[in-house]
């Protein structure tokens, strides 16, 4: 039990908006309340968000105009001993990914309350893209804002080792040890699962946002067909906002397109399926809540692409299967149960309960000085 009463969490958006960072923040708030009796008050920083004044017993304030003054005023309503947890992703707080108002407001607040404790979870550092996109030209400003944030923050956390290294560099010596915590499942973590995949339905799940699932159908149908044949898949379950291009079959295997579903329904489906498929940049799997869900539910995670390096503790062939349609790679050496077990064990090292403990230690950091 903690004597810390309230955390002020700044987020871009919360449900009912579909927002991965908002889901992450809400799941973390639930766990902080469950494990440590810590209450969270949310400040929604996206002025276009539409939602209620509270969610699941957590109160919500909203920045109705992207103004540093308004942010300072809202933060000043709370006792300066209440730590602030910023969930940072530039595009969440400004259209072009450069929330100058947010950084300016936090700087002013820190000037007024120098002993206050600011912990920043960097979900992103800066965007990048081709030279004809605004992200390319604005990435310098985005990095400058991120650097300012690292210097304002008492502690920093992020989801990738690469990001942790960047934070160490741009903070110019302030943060020499930055925790990196791969994201947790936004669909919860099951209390019990069948001990063996053979006890589950021969079902494969394709889950996530429209863009990620559309990429599977646009680029990976041959691989998916190969997977279905090799694993004797009887049904593919497509979960999420309809893509508009989802086929009815992959080979002879029917696709059941069930649309958006509540978390408890998705949880039931994952717990009784054998595999989860994605076509994701393998260097960024630690940031994928979908990959996290596949691992948490002890499915066989399958990704259309693999990385030759071990990144964030994730190794192709050990923690996920990368099918090779040019050869039968389900010989004697292939054990899907072992890969499922390895991915599950990797996930448990940073599951939601463990992460909440780390966040609490950082949020309490100011009280320990």
What do the predicted segments below correspond to?
Residues 11-18, 30-80, 241-245, 289:
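N-terminal strand-loop element at the rim of the active site
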Residues 107-112, 136-156:
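Membrane-proximal helix-turn-helix segments that form the acceptor-binding/catalytic region
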Residues 119, 127-148, 187-189:
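Nucleotide-sugar donor phosphate/pyrophosphate-binding loop at the beta->alpha transition
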Residues 151-199, 203-208:
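Donor nucleotide-sugar binding/catalytic pocket of nucleotide-sugar-dependent glycosyltransferases
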Residues 186-248, 263:
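Conserved catalytic-core segment of nucleotide-activated headgroup transferases in glycan assembly
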Residues 241-242, 255-271, 287:
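Conserved active-site histidine-acidic residue motif and adjacent donor-binding/catalytic loop
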Residues 270-285, 299:
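Acidic donor-binding loop of glycosyltransferase active sites
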Residues 327-368:
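A charged, aromatic-enriched C-terminal amphipathic alpha-helix characteristic of glycosyltransferases
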């Amino acid at each position: 039990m903690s004597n810390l009463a309230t955390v002020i969490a700044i987020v871009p958006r919360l449900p009912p908006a579909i927002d991965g960072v908002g889901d992450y923040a809400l799941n973390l708030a639930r766990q902080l309340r469950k494990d440590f009796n810590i209450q969270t008050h949310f400040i929604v920083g996206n002025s276009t968000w539409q939602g209620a004044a509270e969610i699941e017993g957590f109160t919500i304030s909203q920045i109705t105009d992207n103004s540093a003054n308004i942010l300072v005023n809202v933060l000043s309503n709370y006792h300066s001993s209440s730590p602030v947890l910023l969930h940072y992703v530039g595009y969440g707080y400004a259209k072009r990914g450069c929330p100058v108002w947010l950084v300016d407001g936090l700087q002013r607040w820190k000037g007024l309350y120098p002993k206050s404790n600011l912990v920043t979870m960097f979900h992103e550092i800066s965007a990048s893209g081709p030279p004809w996109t605004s992200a390319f030209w604005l990435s310098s400003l985005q990095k400058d804002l991120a650097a300012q944030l690292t210097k304002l923050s008492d502690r920093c956390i992020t989801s990738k080792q690469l990001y942790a290294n960047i934070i160490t560099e741009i903070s110019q010596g302030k943060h020499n040890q930055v925790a990196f915590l791969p994201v947790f499942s936004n669909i919860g973590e099951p209390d019990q699962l069948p001990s063996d995949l053979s006890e589950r339905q021969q079902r494969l799940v394709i889950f996530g946002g429209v863009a990620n699932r559309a990429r599977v159908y646009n680029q990976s149908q041959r691989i998916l067909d190969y997977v279905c044949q090799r694993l004797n898949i009887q049904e593919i379950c497509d979960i999420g906002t309809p893509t508009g291009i989802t086929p009815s079959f992959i080979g002879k295997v029917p696709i059941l397109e069930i649309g958006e579903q509540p978390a408890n329904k998705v949880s039931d489906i994952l717990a009784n399926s054998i595999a989860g498929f994605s076509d994701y940049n393998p260097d960024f799997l630690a940031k994928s809540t979908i990959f996290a869900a596949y691992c948490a539910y002890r499915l066989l995670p399958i990704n259309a692409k693999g990385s030759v390096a071990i990144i964030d503790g994730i190794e192709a062939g050990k923690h996920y299967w990368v099918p090779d349609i040019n050869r039968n790679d389900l010989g004697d050496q292939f054990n899907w149960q072992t890969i499922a077990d390895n991915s599950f064990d990797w996930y448990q090292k940073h599951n939601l309960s463990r992460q909440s403990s780390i966040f609490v230690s950082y949020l309490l950091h100011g009280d320990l000085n």
